[in-house]
Amino acid sequence: VVVAVLGALIITGEYSSGQIRSSLAAVPRRGRLLLSKAVVLSVVAFLLGSGSVLLSWAISKPFLGEHAGSLTDWDYSAYILGSGLDCVGIALMALGIGFLLRSTAGAITMIVSLLFVADLPLQMMSQKWEWAGKLMECLPRSVAAALSDLSINWSDGTHFLTQSQAIAIFAAWAIIPVIAAWLVFSRRDA
């Protein structure tokens, strides 16, 4: 939630305060402004995601002793890397939606709804309709697990997606809002 709010606030805060005009005066090429915001946000989100997992490992290591994961274990290292990439994807999705909506409340509401609310009705509907379960598996929070949790067996028959398909869908959730934001931002008045 932190990186989603940060992603939305990076641009909606400028729109609400009128600072977007100053930003566009300093960087008149809108694509470059969007790209720079996306790059800085991606670095910060990756560091927040990976850093929080590393910090929780460091705090829990003395208590768990030999039961704590090892940083040399590939599964745990992949979890750290995947958590960072997961945060990058969510932050970019929020940035794109923030550019599109230009409203802090609207962007945050939409992101939180996609991440935490949309799966609830789909989960109830999936008991009656198979398509609802498949759609639920394509939501950002569900496919993000393909990046960070390598222990999930994607070919066990309980998932209709493969791990690579889930990663591609998650990438689409991150990239499509940014591309749409670029298209709209380059043609719309500030």
Predicted regions, residues:
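Secretory targeting signals
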Residues: 1-8, 34-100, 116-127, 145-172
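Transmembrane helix boundary and interhelical loop/hinge segments in multi-pass membrane proteins
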Residues: 4-26, 30-31, 38
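Transmembrane alpha-helix boundary/hinge residues in polytopic small-molecule transporters
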Residues: 19, 54, 92, 108-109
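Residue-level recognition of membrane-helix boundary sites in multi-pass small-molecule transporters
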Residues: 19, 32, 106-107, 165
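Junction motif at the cytosolic side of a transmembrane helix
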Residues: 168-190
